[in-house]
């Protein structure tokens, strides 16, 4: 039930553990901060982390005549969330499903959730280019996907996988909105100086190679990590941080390509 959704953005990563879900949740919160109504769909069936990151674990989803009702983060209902994590009794419960069952669940998430009118739907995907991604692209053909944001870390081993992700996007006809380099440097929580602990500028170099925008470079900032488990936006808590600056830039980028 995506008829009421104006803009659909897919967040991808070639490798797991690069902070894609953190980027997805904080981007959703940043869009809400800018006055938009936002939906966040977590289709990482085997590693759903969005409920934890937003402090929504233990919340229930319900069925209505129109389908599943998403979980709202507050009474304003400006951020709606759907994740398989809400269907699991325990965060440690594994999802042991073969491909066809995963495909069926993702189709349900995309067609049977009662999203109200949304300015943006952010889809947080699992890493890689698997059945889940193909299913998403097939389901979005009718309504259209407005683009993908690819998250990477600066190490070469991660960049190799992102090159595959870029090829996947081109073959499936997804517009790449840009690349975000995450975990580039460590911000000292005391003096806030940033020190590179991995290689640097890998995301920018890859964006140049692929001829797509480089949306920004996010450091490892312990102050951002503390926000996990809440619906607090970096824009509110750390407005002068590099993370807030990059998120603001991405929001402005989305405004330029969005359907109003």
Curated annotation (Swiss-Prot):
Annotated residues for binding of ATP: 14-21
Binding-site residues, [4Fe-4S] cluster: 188, 191
Record localization: Cytoplasm
GO cellular component, one term: cytosol
Gene3D superfamilies attached to this UniProt entry: P-loop containing nucleotide triphosphate hydrolases
SUPFAM superfamilies xrefs: P-loop containing nucleoside triphosphate hydrolases (SSF52540)
Cofactor: [4Fe-4S] cluster
Pfam family, any one: ParA
Keywords: 4Fe-4S, ATP-binding, Cytoplasm, Iron, Iron-sulfur, Metal-binding, Nucleotide-binding
Superkingdom to which the source organism belongs: Eukaryota
Details of cofactor binding: Binds 4 [4Fe-4S] clusters per heterotetramer. Contains two stable clusters in the N-termini of Nubp1 and two labile, bridging clusters between subunits of the Nubp1-Nubp2 heterotetramer.
GO process terms (BP): iron-sulfur cluster assembly
GO molecular function, one term: 4 iron, 4 sulfur cluster binding
Similarity section: Belongs to the Mrp/NBP35 ATP-binding proteins family. NUBP2/CFD1 subfamily.
Function, in words: Component of the cytosolic iron-sulfur (Fe/S) protein assembly (CIA) machinery. Required for maturation of extramitochondrial Fe-S proteins. The Nubp1-Nubp2 heterotetramer forms a Fe-S scaffold complex, mediating the de novo assembly of an Fe-S cluster and its transfer to target apoproteins.
Record note on quaternary structure: Heterotetramer of 2 Nubp1 and 2 Nubp2 chains.
Name under which the protein is recorded: Cytosolic Fe-S cluster assembly factor Nubp2 homolog
Classification of source organism: Eukaryota, Metazoa, Ecdysozoa, Arthropoda, Hexapoda
């Amino acid at each position: 039930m995506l008829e009421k959704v104006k803009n659909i953005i897919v967040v991808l990563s070639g490798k797991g553990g690069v902070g894609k879900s953190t980027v997805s949740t904080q981007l959703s919160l940043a869009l809400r901060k800018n006055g938009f109504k936002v939906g966040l769909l977590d289709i990482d069936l085997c590693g759903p982390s969005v409920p934890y990151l937003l402090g929504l674990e233990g919340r229930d989803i319900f069925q209505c005549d129109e389908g599943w009702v998403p979980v709202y983060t507050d009474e304003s209902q400006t951020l709606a969330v759907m994740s398989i994590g809400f269907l699991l009794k325990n965060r440690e419960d594994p999802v042991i499903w073969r491909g066809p069952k995963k495909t069926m669940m993702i189709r349900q998430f995309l067609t049977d959730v009662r999203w109200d009118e949304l300015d943006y739907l952010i889809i947080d995907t699992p890493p890689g280019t698997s059945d889940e991604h193909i299913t998403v692209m097939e389901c979005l053909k009718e309504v259209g996907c407005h683009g993908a944001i690819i998250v990477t870390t600066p190490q070469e081993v991660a960049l190799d996988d992102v090159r595959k992700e870029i090829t996947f996007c081109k073959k499936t006809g997804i517009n790449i909105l840009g690349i975000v380099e995450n975990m580039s440097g460590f911000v000292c929580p005391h003096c806030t100086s940033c020190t590179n602990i991995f290689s640097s500028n890998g995301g920018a170099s890859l964006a140049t190679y692929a001829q797509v925008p480089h949306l920004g470079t996010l450091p490892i900032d312990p102050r951002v990590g503390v926000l996990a488990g809440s619906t607090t936006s970096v824009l509110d808590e750390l407005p002068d941080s590099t993370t807030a600056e990059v998120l603001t830039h991405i929001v402005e980028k989305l405004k330029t390509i969005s359907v109003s």
